[in-house]
Regions:
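Formylglycine-dependent
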Residues: 89-91, 129, 133-148, 152
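Short, well-ordered alpha-helical scaffold segments within catalytic/effector domains
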Residues: 40, 80, 157-162, 204, ...
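Phosphate/oxyanion-binding active-site loops and adjacent basic polyanion-contact surfaces
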Residues: 75, 153-161, 199-203
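Surface-exposed acidic, glycine-flexible loop patches that form ligand/cofactor-binding
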Residues: 42-45, 85, 165-171, 211-214
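Active-site regions of oxyanion-processing enzymes, predominantly non-cytosolic
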Residues: 125, 129-140, 160-182
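N-terminal catalytic scaffold of extracellular/periplasmic and nuclease hydrolases
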Residues: 1-105, 109-129, 135, 202
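Active-site His/acidic residue clusters
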Residues: 64-69, 144-152, 170-174, 178-211
Length: 214
């Protein structure tokens, strides 16, 4: 079923939580129960079992779907707290938008320095992101959300997918990778067939990278 615990029509927080944890929750929640108790995600289980883990998204990496795999919050829009949750995990690779919540925060916290202290290679240029072949990678492709494919995003999604696969593939135990083409959904919100189709075709290129890797 696709309904959330609070509404016949789900949202990305509740549906992302269902994908990440197998549990229903209320709209707007990020991997917590309707009452606010923490739910364990598949990414966290993978980490616990020695697998490498990664996230790729054409939105901000803090948007509801990717955040549901790594963060826990009753408010999907509490981006400042969601960013801090990234420092509480050992996720190996994440590539997407959202730099401002790590490096230009209103509370003055410098999460970029903290990421570097944890051993992450932090890059903001796609070519530099693609040059990373091992270790931990935090790739920021936009200050907030990435632009639409039709407005110049280019090959960010397939290239980010390929990079994540190559880095995570160094672990002989295996890995978990979540790749989201976020803006297919946004095209639906806009009731724009052109937007949906261009994003779907771009996502198909990312799927091709995954199939080639497999």
């Amino acid at each position: 079923t696709t309904f959330s615990s609070s509404n016949y029509i789900t949202d990305s927080g509740a549906s992302g939580t269902a994908l990440a944890t197998g549990q229903k929750t209320a709209n707007g929640h990020i991997s917590v129960t309707p009452e606010g108790d923490t739910l364990t995600t598949i990414l966290e289980l993978a980490e616990k079992n020695g697998l490498s883990t990664g996230l790729v998204s054409t939105s901000s990496i803090l948007h509801a779907t990717p955040a549901s795999f790594i963060a826990h919050n009753k408010d999907r829009h509490d981006y400042a707290s969601l960013a801090r949750d990234f420092l509480k995990t050992d996720v190996d690779v994440f590539i997407g938008g959202g730099y401002d919540q790590f490096g230009n925060r209103e509370d003055g916290l410098d999460l970029i320095s903290r990421l570097k202290d944890k051993g992450y290679q932090v890059e903001r240029d796609m070519k530099k992101i693609q040059s990373v072949t091992d270790g931990k990678l935090a790739g920021f492709t936009a200050d907030g959300h990435n632009p639409k494919f039709s407005e110049g995003r280019g090959d960010m999604l397939p290239n980010a997918t390929e990079t994540a696969l190559n880095v995570l593939g160094n672990n002989s135990k295996g890995f978990f990778l979540m790749v989201e083409s976020s803006q297919i959904d946004w095209g639906g919100h806009d009731n724009s067939t052109d937007y949906i189709v261009s994003e779907m075709l771009d996502f198909n290129r990312a799927v091709e990278k995954a199939m080639q890797y497999a």
